[in-house]
Amino acid sequence: MSLLRIRKPKTRKGKKVLLAREPQLIESARTMLFLDGRKCGGNVKLCMKDLQALKKPLVKVLNRKNDITPFDDPSSLEFLTMKNDAALFTFGSTSKKRPDNIILGRIFENEVLDMFELGIKRYQAISEFKNEKIGACVKPCLVFNGPKWAQTEELRRLRNLFIDTFQREKVDSIRLQGIEHVLSFTVTDDMNILMRSYRILLKKSGQRTPRIELEEIGPSADFSIRRTKIASEDLYKQARKQPKQLKVGKKKNISTDALGNTKGRVHLGKQQTGSIQTRRVKALRKTPEEKKENRQRKKVALKAAAAEALASQGNNPFSS
């Protein structure tokens, strides 16, 4: 049950705000909501601050402390995400039972879709790395190391959540100098998640392709997976469903060969080649002698037709 009473808009601006919150055919990049629990400090504050820096400008921060327990009762969290029009959220808290705790999750139709509780075992903030940083609003390259990301459904969903979190606007093409940032995620044997952040350096190699070096710029974190809550297969399939308008229809009689060439087959009806108007080339025109012969043939044909008509009238007994 929603805690926010829906009221009909009375102004044009209010209508535009509600229309912007409705599902769009092409969704924009997702905004993340950051909020604190009853007690929050230390590594949790540093981690959330660095995540805000990586996610900017698609962030909304609530500075007040919230008495929320997302895994027990997510209704207050769903209300805040709906009110702030955020599809992603990060909730930070710390307690004696679960120290240095952050919860990452996403929303679908104003309800929690997936939610993962991660414990911070080790953390190095961006400020601890004394080197040059990347610019703002840079789209990072996401690297998921190892086959363990596909072993369980929880890890597959967590990988998908990381992609949703750091994904920005979709682009058709990129330039080589625009690739500046790499975020690496690794699952260890004891099911810990190692997050590393690198800056890409393009060095001269004497060839057309530059030599690439990685410089760690932070944040650097080791997470342990605590509690998880994932959606059912039917709900997850519904959340991933694309509108019919965006689906590419199957094109008939079109195929692609091994070299990537597109070939098409066209079906035509029976053609009347005798009535096709062709270009009259001077070399194909008739000579005066041929024209004279044609006129004589026409005259002979007309005389023969007239004689045949007279003969048929003479043989008719009823003719006067």
From Swiss-Prot:
| Composition bias type Low complexity, residue spans | 302-311
Q: Does the keyword DNA-binding apply?
A: no
Q: GO MF terms on file?
A: rRNA binding
**GO BP:** cell division; maturation of LSU-rRNA from tricistronic rRNA transcript (SSU-rRNA, 5.8S rRNA, LSU-rRNA); ribosomal large subunit assembly
Family matches, as PROSITE patterns: BRIX
Its chief place of residence is nucleus
List the keywords (alphabetical).
Answer: Cell cycle, Cell division, Mitosis, Nucleus
Q: Name one GO cellular component term.
A: nucleolus
Region called Disordered, residue ranges:
268-320
Task: List localization entries.
Answer: Nucleus, Nucleolus
> Which part of the chain is the Brix domain?
30-234
Task: Check the record and name the InterPro entries matching this protein.
Answer: Brix (IPR007109), Rpf2 (IPR039770)
| Family label | Belongs to the RPF2 family.
What is known about what this protein does?
Answer: Required for normal assembly of the mitotic spindle. May be involved in both centrosome-dependent and centrosome-independent spindle assembly programs.
Name of the protein described by the UniProt record: Ribosome production factor 2 homolog
